């Protein structure tokens, strides 16, 4: 049981912290408030990517018309369903119109409570760090009553703004290896990234799903982090991580994806079975995290760039596949299931790889009847014309998605 005064203490601590702390730079993607009269805005993303800060920025704008409650506060760890009544009383006493509910998905039956508050005409913005919990519970009780928003670590432009830098090959390379986690960008202490990695594994996966084979899960996560941009299949990595059951690996990969630590991109195929059994490509949530947890001498810079391009595309597109025919195209962007854009990634085009990169992209252009494509590089500009169409070569730091 949680006392009313405990809720008041948590609310006051949140208010004071937001009033005194640096709430950082504005994000490129604002919270979609235009539909908030009847819908809850649900901000999801990996831990420490800036969800709470984004909520704090909104709180500052709203001032006294809002309540900010951090449900991961230690004083609220024993929250039960019976505590909702006292929480309601506290909210009513404050006369708030906006409820900013940070990490509310850890509460029992939270989605029922949010639905009730929507029916009472509160404007609600919530955050969460687990895609599975959010999607399952939102689909049950908040179907048609929520606006989803995914938040990622800082983009290149946000990185530049935070650091007061300008676009250049040098600042791009700095971003490539440091990534976009806000706290790490302020300190440069790689121990923060290692601690974040372990925190996600423990809190979002091991504890939440009751994983017993902790060492094997650690090996899987480390293996994936060190192989971003590569294809993999569960049967082929069983021996490397000392796990016998393919289904166990598949389940763990789903948990890792639900925590936003990794994304898995499937091969484009018009056959559902072919798509399911084909190897997937793995990408980390952040290139700085991947670099910090890899053996630097063995880091493939091209794969790191490919990972960065994937993150940039995911900021704008939800349907992303790869193409694999006689050649390969790294990214096929779809809209309503229809391929609309094609991207190839190559750190540096040279006589040894140029034909392979162009051939793979042109094959995809012909396959999908798309007369244009892009090759994203570190620092090369060019344009190629062929019977398949036009290919623009663009450095990442000049690329405007």
Q: Where are the regions a protein language model picked out?
A:
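Interdomain hinge/linker elements that couple catalytic modules in large macromolecular machines
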Residues: 2-18, 152-311, 315-325
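A cross-kingdom feature that marks ATP-driven nucleic-acid transaction machinery
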Residues: 2-23, 34-44, 48, 53, ...
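Short glycine-rich substrate-engagement loop in P-loop NTPases that contacts/grips substrate
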Residues: 67-95
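Conserved ATPase-coupling elements of RecA-like P-loop NTPase cores
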Residues: 79, 105-114, 136-137
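Conserved P-loop NTPase "ATPase switch" module shared by AAA+ and STAND
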Residues: 92-110
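Loop/turn-to-beta-strand initiation segments
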Residues: 95-98, 120-125
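Structural recognition of the conserved hydrophobic beta-strand(s) that form the central parallel beta-sheet
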Residues: 123-129, 150
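Short regulatory helix/loop adjacent to the ATP-binding pocket of P-loop NTPases
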Residues: 132-147
């Amino acid at each position: 049981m949680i006392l009313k005064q405990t809720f008041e203490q948590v609310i006051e601590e949140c208010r004071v912290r937001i009033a005194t702390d640096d709430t950082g730079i504005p994000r490129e993607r604002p919270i979609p408030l235009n539909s908030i009269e009847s819908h809850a805005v649900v901000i999801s993303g990996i831990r420490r990517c800036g969800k709470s800060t984004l909520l704090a920025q909104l709180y500052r704008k709203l001032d006294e018309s809002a309540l900010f409650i951090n449900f991961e506060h230690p004083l609220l760890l024993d929250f039960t369903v019976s505590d909702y009544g006292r929480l309601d009383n506290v909210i009513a006493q404050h006369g708030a119109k906006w409820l900013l509910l940070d990490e509310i998905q850890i509460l029992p039956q939270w989605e029922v409570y949010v639905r009730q508050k929507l029916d009472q005409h509160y404007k609600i913005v919530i955050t969460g760090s687990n895609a599975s919990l959010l999607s399952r519970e939102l689909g049950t009780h908040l179907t048609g009553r929520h606006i989803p928003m995914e938040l990622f670590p800082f983009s290149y432009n946000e990185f530049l703004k935070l650091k007061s830098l300008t676009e250049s090959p040098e600042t791009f390379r700095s971003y490539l290896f440091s990534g976009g986690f806000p706290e790490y960008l302020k300190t440069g202490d790689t121990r923060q990234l290692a601690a974040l990695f372990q925190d996600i594994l423990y809190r979002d996966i091991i504890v939440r799903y009751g994983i017993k084979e902790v060492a094997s899960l650690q090996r899987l996560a480390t293996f994936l982090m060190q192989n971003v941009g590569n294809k993999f299949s569960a049967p082929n990595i069983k021996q490397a991580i000392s796990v016998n059951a393919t289904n166990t690996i598949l389940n763990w990969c789903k948990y890792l994806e639900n925590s936003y630590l990794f994304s898995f991109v499937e091969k484009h195929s018009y056959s559902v079975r072919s798509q399911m059994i084909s190897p997937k490509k793995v990408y980390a949530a952040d290139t700085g995290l991947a670099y910090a947890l890899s053996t630097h001498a063995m880091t493939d810079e091209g794969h790191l760039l490919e990972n960065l391009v994937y993150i940039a595309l995911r900021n704008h597109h939800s349907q992303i596949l790869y193409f694999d025919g006689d050649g390969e195209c790294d990214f096929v962007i779809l809209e309503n299931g229809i391929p609309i854009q094609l991207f190839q990634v190559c750190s540096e085009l040279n006589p040894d790889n140029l034909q392979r990169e162009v051939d793979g992209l042109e094959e995809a252009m012909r396959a999908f009847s798309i007369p244009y494509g892009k090759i994203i590089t570190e620092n090369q500009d060019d344009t190629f014309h062929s019977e398949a169409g036009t290919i623009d070569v663009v450095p990442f730091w000049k690329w405007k998605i």
